[in-house]
Amino acid sequence: MAAPGARRPLLLLLLAGLAHSAPALFEVKDNNGTACIMASFSASFLTTYDAGHVSKVSNMTLPASAEVLKNSSSCGEKNASEPTLAITFGEGYLLKLTFTKNTTRYSVQHMYFTYNLSDTQFFPNASSKGPDTVDSTTDIKADINKTYRCVSDIRVYMKNVTIVLWDATIQAYLPSSNFSKEETRCPQDQPSPTTGPPSPSPPLVPTNPSVSKYNVTGDNGTCLLASMALQLNITYMKKDNTTVTRAFNINPSDKYSGTCGAQLVTLKVGNKSRVLELQFGMNATSSLFFLQGVQLNMTLPDAIEPTFSTSNYSLKALQASVGNSYKCNSEEHIFVSKALALNVFSVQVQAFRVESDRFGSVEECVQDGNNMLIPIAVGGALAGLVLIVLIAYLIGRKRSHAGYQTI
């Protein structure tokens, strides 16, 4: 989904270097030549891909040559299809937006991106070849008969891809063949209160979460074994326009389910007010598994937008060799988006290959290794002190015996 703010320091660095070019204009018209979708925006695409035994990041912007792909775009047919804007560019690249509406609002319900790993200009030395398609929901929405307007960056996180739109003007279900004068501005563009920026409320932190145990089984046996305590750190705007950060614990009593696949293992944990989905992927080349995706759908009754949703499918956390288990006693913070951080405590997890429903050999996190340095250093210092005292004692004893020698 769309979420303001960067996911990782690497993304911040790359995004800072983007040249914000002038936005392009795209139109979809019906059979009578009347526009039903208009969109003007600039865009960039950051894609993580495997190149041998390393991961690389490709960075491209929407070129001026991008154009509407007419045979994949439509105004939608009543009760049959959704209005769709498809934009093609480069050698096999496609950005597609599908729209939906209710009685008061319309939205970009889904965004799809197809990229070409055979394009050596942007994906040199890519391990895989050919096209790949990823998708995500978005937070792009506006009132009916109003134009959606967002000057600020809009980030949409997909599997291995982050799409950034800026200087965006979008409208579907047009009442005329032009943008409406009235606008719905995105939350990122909203001005700060004239009384000065409010101090964020201190995090409302509950007690540390309890450890929960999860076991996901498929046709071929157990594909996920996990023991961990999870906590959600969510930042959102309340109805009184103040920003708060709250912590919500995932409880052992929450129900869970999951799926087993050859390349993807999922775990869903939830209750009546929230569903958290964790996706574990696998790099077949390096034989590593890792947490690659997090999606959260939750209800926040005191928020301006009570329905909270965010996701990120470009993560690489909780990583270990397939057949082994990842273990970390230290608290870990996984930044999913600007609005969500996932705190993980006392974790041990193993995905894809689990034998006899037991954890395999342990691969410890770096944090636990660093924590061991302190007791080792203290132990070394104490051993050195004992050695010095022992040497001093032996020297003193030797001198004492020398004073009683027979003349």
Swiss-Prot record:
Pfam families per the UniProt record, alphabetical: Lamp2-like_luminal, Lamp2_2nd
Keyword annotations: Cell membrane, Disulfide bond, Endosome, Glycoprotein, Lysosome, Membrane, Signal, Transmembrane, Transmembrane helix
GO biological process: autophagic cell death; establishment of protein localization to organelle; Golgi to lysosome transport; granzyme-mediated programmed cell death signaling pathway; lysosomal lumen acidification; positive regulation of natural killer cell degranulation; positive regulation of natural killer cell mediated cytotoxicity; protein stabilization
Disordered, as annotated region: 180-211
Segments for region (Second lumenal domain): 220-371
Record has Signal as a keyword: yes
Signal peptide limits: 1-21
Gene Ontology CC, one term: glutamatergic synapse
Posttranslational modification: O- and N-glycosylated; some of the N-glycans attached to LAMP-1 are polylactosaminoglycans.
Membrane topology label: Single-pass type I membrane protein
Cytoplasmic side: 396-407
InterPro entries for the chain: Lamp2-like_luminal, Lamp2-like_TM, LAMP_CS, Lysosome-assoc_membr_glycop
Region (First lumenal domain), start-end ranges: 22-189
Residue stretches of biased makeup (Pro residues): 194-206
GO molecular function terms noted in the UniProt entry: enzyme binding; ion channel inhibitor activity; protein domain specific binding
Disulphide linkage map: C36-C75, C150-C186, C223-C260, C328-C365
Residues bearing attached sugar chains per UniProt: 32, 59, 71, 79, 102, 116, 125, 145, 160, 178, 215, 220, 233, 241, 271, 283, 297, 312
Keyword match Transmembrane helix: yes
Transmembrane segments: 372-395
Parts of the chain on the Lumenal side: 22-371
Subcellular localization: Lysosome membrane; Endosome membrane; Late endosome membrane; Cell membrane
Region called Hinge, residue ranges: 190-219
Family from the record: Belongs to the LAMP family.
Function, in words: Lysosomal membrane glycoprotein which plays an important role in lysosome biogenesis, lysosomal pH regulation, autophagy and cholesterol homeostasis. Acts as an important regulator of lysosomal lumen pH regulation by acting as a direct inhibitor of the proton channel TMEM175, facilitating lysosomal acidification for optimal hydrolase activity. Also plays an important role in NK-cells cytotoxicity. Mechanistically, participates in cytotoxic granule movement to the cell surface and perforin trafficking to the lytic granule.
Oligomeric form and interacting partners: Interacts with ABCB9; this interaction strongly stabilizes ABCB9 and protects ABCB9 against lysosomal degradation. Interacts with FURIN. Interacts with TMEM175; inhibiting the proton channel activity of TMEM175.
UniProt name for this protein: Lysosome-associated membrane glycoprotein 1
Source organism per UniProt: Rattus norvegicus
